[in-house]
Amino acid sequence: ERINSMAYLPNLIFFFLLAAAVGLFTRNFNRISRNIKLGKDVDRNDRPKLRMKYMLRVAFGQSKMVSRPIAGALHLLVYVGFILINIELLEIIVDGLTGAHRIFAPLLGSSLYNFLIASFEVLALLVLVTVVIFWSRRNVMKIKRFWKPEMRGWPKKDADFILYFEVVLMVLFLSMNATDSLLQQANIESYTKAGSFPISQYLLPLFADFSVETRMC
């Protein structure tokens, strides 16, 4: 019984970490919402289509496509890649809470699932390359508009923090797939053989000497 109860320990740890993350997100969301509500109400119900069109252009970087097409395209790549890769986050959460492994694989079928995982890996690599370009433009090339007075201090730190977290997330995603691939090759029980790993396969030598227990952690 003790062994069986210990088997659920990783799921419990994952649950508490997830709950803490959700709690932190909720607190920050409420704080931002409270600050926004300090402003005065303004009737902005006129021209809804035009307002929505403008908001989407600004939000997804399309307004930069005209004045700075390369920067605009790179911004759009990061947005789309980040959103699509976070679809995989749903599976990670379900697996973490239930103790399952790649639970969406049998639901989607091997062909579609393998295609999606491979696509996510390619997107992760493209996001990494794009983030490095963005960081270099801000900190190495020192483009003039990034060094204006209003862009210094917290705005610069905030942008750099976002880029750093993007790198961490993409590296963790690819590392997870690399170790998962090794565990699948080792025929570890309960590890479903699913997924195609065109990018993370090149990370396998980094984890080849790790023990099975270390890879599973």
What does each model-found stretch correspond to?
Residues 2-217:
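Membrane-embedded alpha-helical bundles of multi-pass integral membrane proteins
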